[in-house]
């Protein structure tokens, strides 16, 4: 098998997982570059780096959001870690549809090309990632930029749908003998629920943006008021996907954090069944709250009361997860390895993001907060410190298993501390700006807001330095990393003293060779539970 053939036509879940990882890192660099330009423009009250070209500012906001969400976080958390480890954890030979797995990856590089092209062609897609009509209609954005952004969303949707079908079928049908659904590790449950969410929500998004595409190019009037359409319909279709999407991003992170905390406290996760039900509840409730993004469009009072209450209910299963992790930490033999540092950072910062979310769930308060930097601060605490920290924790936890090479612990710790400090310096001031009424998506602002904006922009520069240190850490690992090949990794210590189960199925990835062989199991494992 030649090198080109192996990587282009691969049907191995491990090779495809590594391709997703490389792709996600490239997309992350593109998206981070855009975010830095956004923050540099906001470092002063008047026109700064973009010379007053506000359209370019909004184009960067659109590109940053689409690249970060669809091309970075989802491909790595679901595509890379999910593909690589889910079959190993359930004792499967490979994914159920191995060739489908290949095409679901190769839908993504054209999506990145479309996003970059949409930024560079004509005036760009200055719509924000929500792509609301009438701003995204042909009258406001006449060039092909918005069409390209829609095509990028179509491609990522196809990729995610095919992947979701694959994950569901693999999980249900390809578990090894002795692994029942209830025994599956929390990361497998997380990917399973995420796949169900993708399967139910993505068709709605695809329908919504396809109608927009037809409005733009075929003179239909779905969102055109003069033709009897309604732009609010688009908001309902978009957010029926958009809210489950935030859980699609964070639920795999929950799974990773569970594994990391379990390993580095030498304890099984507190309340495993409760954790599974909590993930399922979060996923279900995520479909019932979409209009909390739309309190200011003129919903009647009953709708606002319902969506406020339903949104607050999501805090209950989320709280169960947070407190179960804390209960696992309590009395555990903590080892502050790098993945554990990121997991602890995740717990602290994700909780803060959740608390600001509870405030935003109130319809009456949200009227004041809507479209201010308070919202930007909230969702970046959840994404930039929830999803991102869990993603990096997953890389440092499983990276040695994927590549058979150890990372430099000093570099990794510097990466953690600098990132932890810098993301707080960026996003904490945004809450203060939002409370004072600074609107989102607007590059110029009154002088009164300059102080916190300067602080936030300096934090952005610091975060870029931390990202570069993280990349250098990966480079050192891959070029000069201490060899961990051919070792059979022993199971974590807590299993040896855990009488109920000598080797849990969740640790199959820890007891295979590092890196896992091209064919993980020469014969299928049988897991025997000792009771």
Swiss-Prot record:
Any one GO MF annotation of this record: metal ion binding
GO biological process, one term: aerobic respiration
Enzyme Commission code: 7.1.1.9
Binding-site residues for Ca(2+), renumbered to this chain: 41, 46, 443
Catalysis performed (reactions): 4 Fe(II)-[cytochrome c] + O2 + 8 H(+)(in) = 4 Fe(III)-[cytochrome c] + 2 H2O + 4 H(+)(out)
Cofactor binding mode and count: Binds 2 heme A groups non-covalently per subunit. Binds a copper B center.
Cofactor needs: heme; Cu cation
Binding site for O2: 247
Binding site for Mg(2+): 370-371
Family statement: Belongs to the heme-copper respiratory oxidase family.
Subunit structure comment from the entry: Component of the cytochrome c oxidase (complex IV, CIV), a multisubunit enzyme composed of a catalytic core of 3 subunits and several supernumerary subunits. The complex exists as a monomer or a dimer and forms supercomplexes (SCs) in the inner mitochondrial membrane with ubiquinol-cytochrome c oxidoreductase (cytochrome b-c1 complex, complex III, CIII).
Name of the protein in question: Cytochrome c oxidase subunit 1
Organism: Candida albicans (strain SC5314 / ATCC MYA-2876)
Classification lineage: Eukaryota, Fungi, Dikarya, Ascomycota, Saccharomycotina
